[in-house]
């Protein structure tokens, strides 16, 4: 399903269903098997137990979910569709929220220090733990910082705003940000909207986004989508949920079809 047109002209697509194995069973995975360090909010992460933000969040290790997403790509897209995919960035925003967000926020992002990440101040809290009235999602990625830990691509590159991507992905595949899900119409916890654009009534289980939300002092948390109520909320990274793989089609890909359900777009392979 088409999510949006990216800034480089490529077309972002999300799988209409959750990822499934060869037997047709939904693939469920933890975001990270471990949850007891700030490092584990990352789609990729550095060294748990570190005493600096940089060593915690540099992209040295694959998350549990990244391994599952990459395996799905190898099984379903690598052989026949790799040439049609664009290396457009995926954003796992590990930048820190302002110090006034959350409760006892240290704004450090390492070890077991209580830390809140930027997605929470755009989508969940306005100040402290006060629920936000109007969400402010963004399609820009980690624009406040110069480090590239949040901007995932397969090849390191410089964006139009001068920020760099990290080139740490193995394949040009990822997940949606919580901001993209919010733009599609999903609401925050307990605010149901089953008419949101990427809602699928056949999905009955939760699915992960790329968005770090916080480290509570004991647990790393990521935003996920409750498809039953069509809302955004967070849970521990070691919880097993489904995922919906997301890719970007090159701007010049040829296709047939009119885009309606009876005549969907189909890539013309050569």
Region annotations inferred by a language model:
Residues 1-270:
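Long, domain-scale functional regions
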